C-alpha cells in the first residue's frame, strides 16, 4: 500500500478491546510483575480502588495491535509511543481505542496518531488514558 493511500484510509479508526483474564494473566506472565496493586484485591482496596488495577502497559499492547493489525497496511512499524494514564482499568473492562491522524510527514513517510482510550460504560464512556503513536512505513 502506498503512503498516501494509507493516510487516506486511516484518518480515524476505532477498535474495541476486552481486558479478559487471559489478557491480564498473559501480561503478568510476560512482564513478571506481581506488584500487589495488580495482584492482591485486599491491597488494592486498602489503597482506595474497588478491585485490582490492571497493568497500564496492557494498553501499550492494544496500541501494538492497532498498528500491526487494525491499520489497513502491514507495512508499518511503531517508532515512538506514549500513554498518559488518567483512570484505572479493571478486569473485564471493555476499552474503546479511538485513533486519529494528528500530523503527517510526507517527506519521511511518518504518521502521528492521537490516541484516546475509553472505558465503555452504559451511560457515558470514561476517558482512561490518552497518548500518541508515531508510525513509519516499511520499504
Where are each of the predicted segments found?
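HotDog/MaoC-like acyl-thioester-processing domains
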Residues: 1-12, 89-139
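Hot-dog-fold acyl-thioester-processing enzymes
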Residues: 1-76
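Generic structural detector for well-ordered beta-strands
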Residues: 16-18, 84, 134-136
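Short, intrinsically disordered/low-complexity patches at protein termini
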Residues: 37-38, 49, 62, 77-78, ...
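Sparse recognition of residues in long alpha-helices and their boundaries
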Residues: 43, 79, 108-109
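Mid-chain, well-packed structural core segment of small domains
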Residues: 69-97
